[in-house]
Every structure is written in C-alpha cells, then in structure tokens.
C-alpha cells in the first residue's frame, strides 16, 4: 500500500519527525519536547509537548495517539485519556496527555519516545432515529455476555 502524505510543521527546533520503528510498524513514534526531564509521580498527569503540528489528508482521516506498550507495561505510563483523537481539521501542536499508573515515579527524558501516532480512515455517520433495530443473535447482551 502506498503511504499517504501527512504534512507536518515544526513548532520547536528540538522536535523529531514521527518515525516508524520497523517496516511493519502500524504507528509512528512521537517524542517529547521538554526543556528538562519531567518526573511523574504515581497517579500524576502531564501534557507532554511534541513540538509538531500535522495536516491530515482530507476530512475522512484521523490520527490516533496511543501509549507505547513498553512504557505502559514496564512503568505504568499511559495515555490519560485512553486514546488521543486528532481530528482532520486540527492544526495545533500535538500534545500527549500522560498519566503514571505505576507504583514508582517515572522520569520522561527530553527526546524520549512517549506515544505512537496511527493514521486511519474515518467514516462519518448519518444518525437516523428508528423505532426498532434489527435482531441479532447477541441482542442486548454486553459486558461479558459472550463469555470468557
């Protein structure tokens, strides 16, 4: 598949261009742009700047920001909002809302890879009111209703 073009603007000279770690990576790494190391105590949150703004190609794309698996598993450093959603019309700086869910403080170093950016297509929906919804085998079952 051909790569799509995502224009980016450097807002801070220390910013690193998002990069894919391997040819099979689904997301590109985002790096912290910090004046000094940032220590997050357990349960502390911070908005980590990247020094970059992006322009997504058209209204039917989105950038999703995810935690890096190694940081979350080894240190409890996660996205404070679960998944960051960057809308196609947003032109401000990409910032990563992070929370330390670990038991020990964690220090983010300037230039450290802190999150992953995944570009994906988006469907917009026309929401239509309905008196009845189609039947399915699952029906209204949710929250573990399909078993372990």
Which positions does each model-derived feature cover?
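DUTPase catalytic domain/fold
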Residues: 1-148
């Amino acid at each position: 598949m051909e790569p799509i073009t995502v224009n980016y603007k450097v807002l801070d000279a220390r910013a690193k261009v998002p990069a894919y770690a391997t040819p099979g990576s689904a997301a590109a790494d985002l790096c912290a742009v910090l004046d000094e190391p940032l220590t997050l105590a357990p349960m502390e949150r911070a908005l980590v700047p990247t020094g970059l703004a992006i322009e997504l190609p058209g209204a039917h794309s989105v950038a999703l920001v995810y935690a890096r698996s190694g940081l979350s598993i080894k240190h409890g450093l996660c996205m404070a909002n679960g998944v960051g959603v960057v809308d196609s019309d947003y032109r401000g700086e990409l910032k990563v809302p992070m929370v330390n869910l670990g038991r020990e403080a964690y220090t983010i170093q300037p230039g450290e890879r802190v999150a992953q950016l995944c570009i994906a297509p988006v469907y917009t929906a026309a929401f239509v009111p309905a008196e009845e919804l189609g039947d399915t085998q699952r029906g209204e079952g949710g929250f573990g209703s399909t078993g372990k």
